Amino acid sequence: MYKRQTHAGWQDRDPAAPVTHISYFEADAFASWAGQRLPTEFEWEAIARGQEGQAPAHDPHEGNQLDEAAPPLPHGSSGLFGDCWQFTRSAYLPYPRFQPAEGAVGEYNGKFMSGQFVLRGASCATARGHSRASYRNFFYPHQRWQFTGLRLAKDI
């Protein structure tokens, strides 16, 4: 069993806890190894809409950490908000028919945004306003972040 060091000494890791601090490439490789795949951002959002509004409350007196996990959905999905940002297989590009507002600096700036993948969900460090099914985060595929993880999808 894996252990982690805490202020109280070495503790067993929770085998049911999400894997975090991984890159897109590692998430995609694991999904392939498991005979599954990463969901598209649209698949992820469709599932998450059933859990939206059930996101755990943030306690401002405890920093910005989530106090508890949202309950599972009827079809069994859980951990969509609060555990970690989950990689999707979708490139971070403008939505179809996106038109920038006049005078906008440009959220989809090719120099800055190119080559990144969409993350969905939220972590314990996510601001409450970003913990929603429609929020799009993004990250470079070769980099790891302590708040990134994965969710698997399977064609049926």
Predicted segment positions?
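Short proline/glycine-enriched turn/loop segments at secondary-structure junctions
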Residues: G106-K111, N137-R144
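Functional-site microenvironments in short loops/helix caps that host divalent-cation chemistry
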Residues: R4-R132
